[in-house]
């Protein structure tokens, strides 16, 4: 409902296209940067070097990177209701874009439908606000079993991987988002971090970009983003923007290569960057999606899939920072696009 309202609020189909192009471009560029940072940290820290651990012999199902034609075809729903029941975010987004565009084209005759959808969006925001009142209890409940089930026996041998992923996510947030916010959005990075903190914490504990979306939207609007832009950019980001996950891909791909004593070539490094960026578009923002993307990259590199079984044991711990960075990136891009649109509106304003 929020995306439909976002499209109808923009009011101009050309404006929807302009914002859409800018949004996707920002998301793809930041994702590529994140993978490069992950590769750099993996190269410097070398988390797999000297780790003498037998890989789990259990078979790990290979996930080949989908061809671009399949990615495009799969985003169009054959049954919108089925897409909503199965929480297929890509198809829901496309369906919402069509509905929003249709309402905009029809105009006044569709106002009743527009108001109904707007009401649904407001109700969902209110429900999220009520949930946030007891969120600290929920956060504690979500994190406790993760810590309890991943004790020292599991964590210590892979501690270097955990540190590398957390460090890559932190560096990406500070340097990439920090530069974007300061120089392109014209905002203090400290102010931005304080404003997005509630959503980042919720994403950290829930490991779901989609589940955190209403709260992310609220935080972005409090930071100054318009409702029309945030309602369009953020739902899109929850599906295709996975910067934290991309940083994780870079670290973990190198970890597995180092674990097996395999030296990657320059072309293989480029394969990681390209495959990881494209896979982020075709993977929904749900818990564990990053692990599916990792198997795609390992398959494209010809690395042993058994190595991913080692990562699976600590994947939940690695999922927390990457999801937090994912939604932080969504908010950063929202502020950038909003700033750009405000400048565009000022440039087109008539002079008297």
Language model features by range: what are they?
Residues 9-15, 50, 106-111, 119, ...:
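Juxtamembrane helix-boundary/capping and inter-helix hinge elements in multi-pass membrane proteins
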Residues 1-5, 39, 43, 97-101, ...:
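Transmembrane alpha-helix boundary and packing residues in multipass membrane permease domains
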Residues 198-280, 334, 346-352:
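Helix-loop-helix junctions within the multi-pass membrane cores of secondary transporters/permeases
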Residues 50, 250-352:
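Transmembrane alpha-helical segments and their short flanking loops
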Residues 23-28, 98, 162, 166, ...:
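Transmembrane helix-bundle signature of multi-pass membrane transporters/permeases
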Residues 11-14, 22-191, 351-352:
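Signature of multi-pass transmembrane helix bundles
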Residues 17, 152-160, 186-197, 262-271, ...:
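Membrane-water interface of transmembrane alpha-helices in multipass transporters/channels
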């Amino acid at each position: 409902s929020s995306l439909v309202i976002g499209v109808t609020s923009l009011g101009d189909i050309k404006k929807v296209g302009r914002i859409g192009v800018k949004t996707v471009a920002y998301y793809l560029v930041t994702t590529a940067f994140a993978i490069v940072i992950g590769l750099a940290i993996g190269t410097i820290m070398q988390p797999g070097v000297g780790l003498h651990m037998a890989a789990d012999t259990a078979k790990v199902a290979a996930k080949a990177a989908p061809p671009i034609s399949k990615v495009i075809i799969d985003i169009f729903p054959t049954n919108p209701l089925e897409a909503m029941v199965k929480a297929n975010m890509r198809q829901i987004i496309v369906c919402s874009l069509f509905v929003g565009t249709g309402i905009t084209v029809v105009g006044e005759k569709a106002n009743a439908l527009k108001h109904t959808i707007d009401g649904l969006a407001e109700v969902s925001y209110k429900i999220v606000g009520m949930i946030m009142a007891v969120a600290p209890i929920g956060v504690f409940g979500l994190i406790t079993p993760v810590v309890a089930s991943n004790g020292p026996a599991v964590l210590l041998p892979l501690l270097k991987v955990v540190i590398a992923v957390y460090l890559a996510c932190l560096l990406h947030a500070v340097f990439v988002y920090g530069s974007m916010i300061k120089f392109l959005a014209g905002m203090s990075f400290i102010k931005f971090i304080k404003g997005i903190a509630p959503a980042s914490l919720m994403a950290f504990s829930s490991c779901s970009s989609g589940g955190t979306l209403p709260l992310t939207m609220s935080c972005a609007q409090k930071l100054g983003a318009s409702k029309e832009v945030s309602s369009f950019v953020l739902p899109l980001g929850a599906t295709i923007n996975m910067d934290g996950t991309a940083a994780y891909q870079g670290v973990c791909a190198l970890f597995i290569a180092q674990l097996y004593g395999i030296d990657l070539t320059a072309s293989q490094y480029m394969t990681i960057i390209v495959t990881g960026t494209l896979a982020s578009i075709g993977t929904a923002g749900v818990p564990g999606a990053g692990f599916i993307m990792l198997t795609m990259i390992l398959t494209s590199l010809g690395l042993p899939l058994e190595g991913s079984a080692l990562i699976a044991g600590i994947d939940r711990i690695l999922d927390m920072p990457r999801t937090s960075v994912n939604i932080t990136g969504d908010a950063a891009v929202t502020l950038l696009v909003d700033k750009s649109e405000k400048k565009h509106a000022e440039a087109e304003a008539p002079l008297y």
